[in-house]
Amino acid sequence: MSIFLCFLLLLPLSLIFLKKLLPSKGKLPPGPKGLPIIGNLHQFGRFLHKSLHKISQEYGPVMLLHFGVVPVIIVSSKEGAEEVLKTHDLETCSRPKTVGSGLFTYNFKDIGFAPYGENWREMRKIAVSELFSQKKLKSFRYIREDESQLLVRKVSKSALETPTSSVNLRKVIFTFAASIICRLSFGQNFCDFVDMETVEELVLESETNLGSLAFADFLPAGWIIDRISGQHSTVMKAFSKLTNFFELVIDDHLKSGKIEDHSDIISVMLDMINKPTEVGSYKVTDDHLKGLMSDVFLAGVNAGSITMIWTMTELSRHPRVMRKLQEEIRAALGPNKEKITEEDLEKVEYLKMVIEEAFRLHPPAPLLLPRLTMSDINIQGYSIPKNTMIQINTYTIGRDPKNWTKPDEFIPERFVDNPIEYKGQHFELLPFGAGRRVCPGMATGITIVELGLLSLLYFFDWSLPNGMTTKDIDMEEDGAFVIAKKVSLELVPTLHRW
């Protein structure tokens, strides 16, 4: 009843806001008519990307919807995405501010959600220099290979001790990805002193609240409803847990004297924080450190593990592809290898096609991080005013029959002699985005995915648990911002005999 009264009180304010938003200076995109106050929010189901996909089938690849009183442009075509991310990259490379993104990035002191400007440029410079440069990628190679060997040992132990028992691949793969990201970013392997189930819970809870829609984001005085509904309290609890975890990691660096060795991003930034700053120069603070930790920890851990799990899921559903892939891998690498190295990644072309096909059907973030126009622009013949939010639906683009034959089927061979790849130059496939706001950790992320999958597919043969068929594999999704497989993938590993 109290929430209903809030809506009644907000109605006059909402009507005033609607009159001021999106002044008509030209032809606006089409879209479904919304309701007072809530706009089109009532048309969204559990998964926003699927709801927008369905609406786009009626209204086209460039639509105008209202999230509450906030106008949002939805782009669902390769051509529209190219205009936003390439033609008008500079004019659209800022970010809208939301409650969740502001909180979990410590007031936008990160790279991913920071509005375009000095803070974003400086933070990106630090991240690229200390984490994502080619030099750093090579220097961290031993960490990735160490963890891939540990992954193989864990699965081997299970295969030998309980030959007919299944392995929960979500847990195994999450630990693999989290261990790599935490070692190369934070200089610590949390497996040694933190329960990985707790870490997984923390990542999922933080990401869910980061990607959740708050009433305050889309309604004037919506913060009142957030507090009455309990949304504000839920988000704050998740944020508090994440902050406590980060402070534990930072305190460990301070106690162990790691600041001086500059071996990881935390020690580098702590040194920057402690050094005197010249007048007029950029000042790095504790919030900048935590903001960057949030980006790396949440996006780095979850996106990589989710892609690996969806890939193994599709391979399990398509035994022909699994057989073909494993035959190619083993023929290319030869028998009885003791370990997989990153040189081996250049020998397995079909694996790269399989991963690209998984990206097409299961992009980790089916809606790219929203952009905000910094000037009036024109997209596909429609006028888009300054300060308008733009969402690009890569889920729809990846299933567009104009770009893909049999778009709903898992067919890695579609990438044979096909120039399309995932690095941001081809707008049919955008798992990492494109333009100035492309994911800076793309090379690191894809290397982790390829190395982990290659290790699992070279050393083990995989089968479904007894009595289960490919039709029984559950494909239900879960998540808010990053979309994971809801039901854990359970497979039976058998050490391959040569």
Swiss-Prot record:
CDD domains (UniProt xref): CYP71-like
Task: List all membrane-crossing ranges.
Answer: 3-23
This enzyme's EC code(s): 1.14.-.-
- UniProt keyword annotations, A-Z: Heme, Iron, Membrane, Metal-binding, Monooxygenase, Oxidoreductase, Transmembrane, Transmembrane helix
User: Where can this protein be found?
Assistant: Membrane
**Where do the annotations place heme binding?**
439
Main localization (coarse): membrane
Q: Which PANTHER family match?
A: CYTOCHROME P450 71B11-RELATED (PTHR47956), CYTOCHROME P450 71B38-RELATED (PTHR47956:SF6)
State the family it belongs to.
Belongs to the cytochrome P450 family.
Q: What is this protein called?
A: Cytochrome P450 71B5
Q: Which organism is it from?
A: Arabidopsis thaliana
